[in-house]
């Protein structure tokens, strides 16, 4: 490539993506709140029924090339980067085009078997053009990630989200009068526009940096070995992601089916599913702003440490330790606040009080969800894609069995789904942790990773229960009292971490 780009370190890269993800998550959360208020729980339920099938098609089109490209170009020279990028670009262009055409051709079959409400058909058809756009963009994302230029990823995410939110809100508001199905399709159109904006932003940044990854031509003899290496790494990864996406797709079909078995009608089922996926899970994913940034930086960092024979083991241990500790430090207070403030969050933001109890059941398991995501990135960096595949299969089977058994119980309903997710996340975390220990033979300091954050969480909860009666009975309004308690929890948590030394190792 034309210029030598300086890589950004693990902590710096995470910090840059953290800032970007705060903006992206903030915009996305605002967008979700507005959509729920515009479309209602029933409308957002239709959107969420399409999302797992769309995600499955995206993974199928991507062939696992983005993480493969990221790992293969990490620490390599410019000539090899150009070669792998060009090979990845053509794989993704072909994959995205073929999957989109196949989805259009077989859409009646897909809708009949994987989406329980026929009103979501228009939403599904209008989102399909995003598939080739996302596929092509993943080549640039994998290249930037492998070079550890994560700031470029952050800029493109911001552009993508800003366009999606602006187009989505404007178009949904204008199409509400045309009916719920048409208004729901506006969210799909907004997704297509946002992904296109993100792709254009990535291309512009690459050209602005003086990099021309497609400028140098390569012969078929040069490209074929690169294609084979990309697919050799990416296809097992695709299998794992396809299984994860297939599980989400089956989950989106199985939950409404089990709720129907438990006695709810079609409209009630769609509304309940909207509360679960559109409200409760949206809030649960909000604290993931940090872990999302962390996982993007961890994969190439772990891959690079594996290449350094002399100091690789110590560096690998430190990076795995730091990533787990950082995930724990940021996840615990987030889950605590969601558990304590589920009622006001669901009522004030979404005007959907019934979703609060679902969120309370999901919050404890959310801790293991975020740790599982972090460990999955570590395993990707180690190249243990087959292990990830087996772990995904096992935890997915447990999830689907739990949903089928628990959600069908009239006394549990959608709460059974939440419990099944908690069990599945715990299982996935334990499987990933065991795999990391087995593959790396390193020892982790769980006193720093979990002990100190748990201590800080316990102290914060104790202070909360002491202060709550005093603040509630004071002259403060209920909203002001809740805000004061929230600040008190965060302040106590941070202070306890500082005193116990729970933050001193997070310096990179």
What label would you give each PLM region?
Residues 1-27, 221-241, 505-508:
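N-terminal membrane topogenesis motif
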Residues 89-113, 170, 317-368, 400-401:
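Alpha-helical transmembrane segments of multi-pass membrane transport and lipid-handling proteins
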Residues 151-152, 162-201, 205, 386, ...:
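Membrane-interface helix-loop junctions in multi-pass transport and translocation proteins
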Residues 62-77, 284-314, 320-324:
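Helix-loop junctions and terminal segments of transmembrane helices
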Residues 241, 447-507:
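Transmembrane alpha-helical segments of multi-pass transport proteins
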Residues 134-156, 364-394:
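Membrane-interface junctions at transmembrane-helix termini in multi-pass inner-membrane proteins
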Residues 96-242, 246:
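Hydrophobic transmembrane helix module of multi-pass membrane transport proteins
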Residues 116-139, 336, 340, 351-375, ...:
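Alpha-helical transmembrane segments of multi-pass membrane proteins
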């Amino acid at each position: 490539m034309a210029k030598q780009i300086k890589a950004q370190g693990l902590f710096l890269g995470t910090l840059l993506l953290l800032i970007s993800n705060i903006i992206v998550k903030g915009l996305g959360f605002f967008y979700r709140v507005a959509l729920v208020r515009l479309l209602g729980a029933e409308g957002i339920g239709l959107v969420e029924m399409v999302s797992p099938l769309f995600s499955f098609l995206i993974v199928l089109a991507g062939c696992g090339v983005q993480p493969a490209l990221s790992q293969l170009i990490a620490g390599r020279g410019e000539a090899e980067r150009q070669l792998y990028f060009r090979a990845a670009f053509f794989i993704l262009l072909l994959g995205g085009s073929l999957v989109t055409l196949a989805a259009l051709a077989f859409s009646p079959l897909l809708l009949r078997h994987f989406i329980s409400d026929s009103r979501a058909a228009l939403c599904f058809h209008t989102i399909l053009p995003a598939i080739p756009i996302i596929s092509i963009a993943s080549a640039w994302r994998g290249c930037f990630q492998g070079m550890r230029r994560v700031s470029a990823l952050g800029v493109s995410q911001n552009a993508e989200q800003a366009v999606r939110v602006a187009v989505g809100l404007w178009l949904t508001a204008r199409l509400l009068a045309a009916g719920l199905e048409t208004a729901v399709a506006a969210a799909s159109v907004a997704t297509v526009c946002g992904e296109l904006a993100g792709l254009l932003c990535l291309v512009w940044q690459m050209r602005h940096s003086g990099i021309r990854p497609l400028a140098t031509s390569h012969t078929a003899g040069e490209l074929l070995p690169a294609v084979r290496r990309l697919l050799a790494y990416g296809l097992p990864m695709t299998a794992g992601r396809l299984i994860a996406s297939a599980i989400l797709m089956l989950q989106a079909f199985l939950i409404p089916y089990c709720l129907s078995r438990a006695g709810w009608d079609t409209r009630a089922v769609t509304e309940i599913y909207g509360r679960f996926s559109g409200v409760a899970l949206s809030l649960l994913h909000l604290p993931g702003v940090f872990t999302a940034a962390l996982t993007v930086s961890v994969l190439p960092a772990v891959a690079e440490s594996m290449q350094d024979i002399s100091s690789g083991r110590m560096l690998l241990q430190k990076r795995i330790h730091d990533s787990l500790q950082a995930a724990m430090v940021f996840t615990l207070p987030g889950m605590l606040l969601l558990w304590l403030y589920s009622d006001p969050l669901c009522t004030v933001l979404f005007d959907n009080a019934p979703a609060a109890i679902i969120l309370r059941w999901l919050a404890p398991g959310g801790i293991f969800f975020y740790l599982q995501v972090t460990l999955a990135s570590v395993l990707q960096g180690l190249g243990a894609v087959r292990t990830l595949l087996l772990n995904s299969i096992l935890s997915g089977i447990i999830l689907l069995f739990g949903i089928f058994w628990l959600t069908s119980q009239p006394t549990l309903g959608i709460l059974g789904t939440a419990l099944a997710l908690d069990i599945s996340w715990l299982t996935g975390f334990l499987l990933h942790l065991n795999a990391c220990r087995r593959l790396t033979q390193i020892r982790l300091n769980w006193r720093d990773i979990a002990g100190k954050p748990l201590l800080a969480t316990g102290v914060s909860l104790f202070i909360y229960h002491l202060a709550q009666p005093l603040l509630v009975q004071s002259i403060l309004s209920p909203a002001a009292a809740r805000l004061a308690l929230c600040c008190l929890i965060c302040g106590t948590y941070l202070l306890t971490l500082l005193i116990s030394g729970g933050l001193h190792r997070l310096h990179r």
